[in-house]
From Swiss-Prot:
This is dTTP/UTP pyrophosphatase. Pfam families: Maf. GO terms for biological process: nucleotide metabolic process. Its EC number is 3.6.1.9. GO terms for molecular function: dTTP diphosphatase activity; UTP diphosphatase activity. It comes from Clostridium perfringens (strain SM101 / Type A). Nucleoside triphosphate pyrophosphatase that hydrolyzes dTTP and UTP. May have a dual role in cell division arrest and in preventing the incorporation of modified nucleotides into cellular nucleic acids. The active site is at residue 70.
Length: 192
């Protein structure tokens, strides 16, 4: 059975390559703005990942396992997704500075052969060091934060701001590896 990653994220591709040797990337065209956050972060990221997987699975013509994910940063009751502008990134990074936040990733696997759907969610707590405005501006000028939830990438330059994490590192990158591995064990595909 084919494995399809419903994501254009190079980080998700890199993570999936650790456990699945052969898969295809098919970008989801699901409009994430059609789902509003209503207070339950786990439900929100699961719903987003499920809808991404459904959209891709409808375009496939052969039995496949479709994997989709969605990641958000959550702090003080607010969801921080990808910044819309450099000012938005500055505001996000300023709020993360010196504080702890949580990163939630929802995953969804759809077996197109029998239409079974599996969803799960992981949460990682991240503590940022204090950042001054110059450090934040320099980071924004690198371009790195503009396509990442919460305006930082732990695997890149943004990792320098992280004092500690509690939970799955790969979850912060966008795909909770351990949860995904456990979910994939239920299918007849070669992993590891």
């Amino acid at each position: 059975m084919k494995v399809i990653l419903a994501s254009k994220s190079p980080r998700r591709v890199e993570i999936l390559e650790k456990i699945v040797k052969e898969f295809e990337v098919v970008q989801s065209n699901f409009d994430e703005n059609t789902i509003d956050f209503k207070g339950d972060v786990e439900k929100y990221v699961k719903d987003l990942s499920r809808n991404k997987a459904i959209e891709v699975s409808k375009r496939l013509n052969e039995p496949s396992i479709v994997i989709a994910a969605d990641t958000v940063v959550f702090q003080n009751g607010k969801v921080l997704e990808k910044p819309k502008s450099e000012e938005d990134a500055f505001s996000m990074l300023s709020s993360l500075s010196g504080n702890t936040h949580k990163v939630y990733s929802g995953i969804c696997l759809i077996n197109t052969y029998d239409d079974t759907v599996v969803t799960d969610c992981d949460c990682t707590e991240v503590k940022f060091s204090e950042l001054n405005p110059r450090q934040i501006r320099n980071y924004i000028n690198s371009g790195e934060p503009m396509d990442k939830a919460g305006a930082y990438g732990i695997q890149g330059l943004g990792g320098a701001f992280v004092e500690r994490i509690e939970g799955c590192y790969y979850n912060v990158m966008g795909l909770p590896l351990n949860k995904l591995y456990k979910a994939l064990e239920n299918y007849d595909i070669t992993i590891l």
